[in-house]
């Protein structure tokens, strides 16, 4: 079984999702493909996930890292599950702006992932990247479950 984690530079989120997954018997021997476009953040997550694999999973999973758009299809190839955790535009400045613009005009923005003005901004930034992901998934792992 293969799990590809898109946006693996989100270290805390990848640690939580993959760590929880490793706790399930069905996923002990899985292949984990960590994908990100930021080398430093990817390496940070890779070291953490590798350490977790050793400590809570007895090293049973195979953990690989894939950097950049040119390695995206390799990360996805043969995946059974694709977890998406990308943030186009980074927290600073984009997510901060997603909160500041509604506030400036007196609109309450409780969360900017999917709701309100901030959610619209985030969606507009993200949709073109997700379309690229979808094309690659259709080509190299058409039966994968995409979890956003």
What do the PLM-derived regions correspond to, one by one?
Residues 2, 31, 62, 145:
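Residues at the starts of beta-strands that form the adenosine-phosphate
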Residues 81-103:
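Short, solvent-exposed beta-strand-terminating loops
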Residues 55-80, 87-90, 109-115, 119, ...:
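A structured beta-alpha segment of the ubiquitous adenosine-cofactor-binding alpha/beta core
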Residues 23-60:
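Glycine-rich phosphate-binding loop and adjoining beta1-alpha1-beta2 segment
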Residues 4-28:
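N-terminal Rossmann-like dinucleotide-binding module
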Residues 125, 138-145:
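A short helix->loop->beta-strand "cap" motif at the edges of active sites that frequently abuts
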